[in-house]
């Protein structure tokens, strides 16, 4: 019987090995066939792109000023330049990756950080110079900003974006590389760059000279054309530019001002993300009252979207809830390095009960109490955690997490006794 079983297992292993070998052979053959097809299609696509580029360039040389057709040709040529730059960068990356796999440890060092999108920028800047009333000028300015930002030139990108969404206050100068260099090196004698290029002053504080209070530079903005496209995305990118600026004293205020433009429309597809960024900007600036209000607004908006559509409004809801807990548990809201309780201020538990900071009647309200208690527990402030959890259990006895937090309270008591 054992010999029969062993023979059967040997036969099965042989069949499995043969089938697997044939499967791998066929898969390798198909992979090679598809790879050849893909390479051929890519070659044909690249050749077609180069022919199209040559045709558009020839057309533009022949008809450089036709207001009806030349800007369209330039716009399409810029897209083709963008595609070519992206393909060239990918080819460089693939070659460097292969070289490193073959033992060249320094192969990636010479790789540029981003595609060279300057040809696209140049042709689109030419549109701005020659055809400022082009019907797709919104897309031109957005893509100029996008390309410059990809090439790590964020100040120039911001200028293009502001000209798109705030055209009544900011004009775009296609020669911005020159005037930014002048701003860094000093203006030539008799040349007033600040007057000629007002966007040079965007990096400085925007304040009322009498009160020294921040004045929103984006309060009354109008787009470069009615019904302009890319407005929401552009305001978000402007907000990100300011949010990442750690030099300007009013960078956080400017980022909030940009995000708030998006928040004017609750139906905007970037609404939830902008709301989160506003909350985070307030948190980063230690403006904790505004931070908790906006994190709470995000949680409520996400839940409203869930109720209306069956889908969560924001994937950032859990993180917003986490930061609500962190902020309420933080003990120095006035940021003077002295605990608030030592100055007669409120405790985290007291702030949780403050209706002005945290609505007490929302479905998610007990979750904030639970999250705050968790922060106190992680900080080994067990009594604070127990007090908050006991309050939450008493006020929301039917909450789904009641059994869990009964156990957490018991655990906290044990840890406190150790």
Predicted feature locations:
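Acidic, polar-rich low-complexity tracts and alpha-helical solenoid repeat scaffolds
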Residues: 1-418
């Amino acid at each position: 019987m054992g010999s029969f079983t062993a023979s059967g297992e040997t036969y099965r292993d042989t069949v499995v090995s043969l089938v697997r070998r044939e499967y791998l052979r066929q898969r390798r053959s198909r992979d090679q066939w598809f790879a050849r097809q893909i390479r051929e299609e890519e070659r044909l696509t690249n050749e077609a792109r180069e022919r199209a580029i040559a045709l558009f360039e020839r057309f533009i040389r022949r008809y450089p000023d036709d207001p009806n057709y030349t800007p369209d040709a330039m716009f399409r040529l810029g897209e083709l330049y963008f595609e070519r730059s992206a393909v060239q960068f990918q080819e460089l990356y693939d070659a460097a990756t292969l070289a490193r796999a073959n033992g060249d440890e320094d192969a990636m060092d010479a790789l540029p950080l981003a595609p060279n999108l300057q040809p696209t920028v140049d042709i689109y800047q030419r549109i701005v110079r020659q055809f400022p009333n082009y019907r797709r000028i919104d897309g031109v300015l957005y893509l100029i900003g996008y390309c410059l930002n990809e090439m790590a030139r964020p100040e120039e990108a911001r200028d293009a974006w502001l000209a798109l969404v705030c055209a009544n206050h900011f004009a775009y100068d296609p020669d911005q590389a020159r005037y930014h260099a002048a701003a860094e090196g000093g203006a030539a004698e008799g040349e007033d760059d600040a007057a000629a290029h007002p966007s040079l002053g965007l990096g400085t504080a925007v304040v009322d000279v009498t009160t020294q209070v921040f004045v929103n530079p984006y309060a009354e903005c109008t787009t470069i054309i009615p019904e302009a496209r890319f407005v929401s995305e552009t305001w978000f990118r402007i907000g990100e530019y300011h949010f990442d600026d750690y030099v300007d004293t009013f960078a956080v205020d400017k980022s909030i001002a940009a995000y708030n433009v998006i928040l004017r429309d609750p139906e905007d597809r970037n609404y939830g993300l902008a709301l989160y960024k506003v909350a985070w900007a307030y948190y980063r600036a230690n403006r904790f009252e505004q931070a908790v209000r906006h994190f709470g607004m995000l949680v409520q908006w996400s839940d409203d979207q869930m109720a209306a559509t069956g889908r969560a409004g924001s994937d950032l809801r859990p993180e917003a809830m986490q930061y609500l807990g962190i902020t309420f548990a933080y003990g120095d809201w006035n940021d003077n390095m002295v605990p608030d309780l030592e100055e007669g201020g409120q405790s985290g538990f007291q702030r949780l009960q403050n209706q002005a900071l945290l609505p007490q009647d929302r479905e998610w309200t007990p979750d904030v109490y639970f999250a705050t208690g968790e922060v106190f527990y992680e900080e080994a402030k067990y009594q604070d955690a127990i007090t908050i959890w006991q309050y939450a259990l008493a006020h929301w006895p039917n909450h789904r997490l009641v059994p869990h937090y009964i156990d957490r309270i018991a655990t906290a008591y044990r840890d406190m006794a150790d």
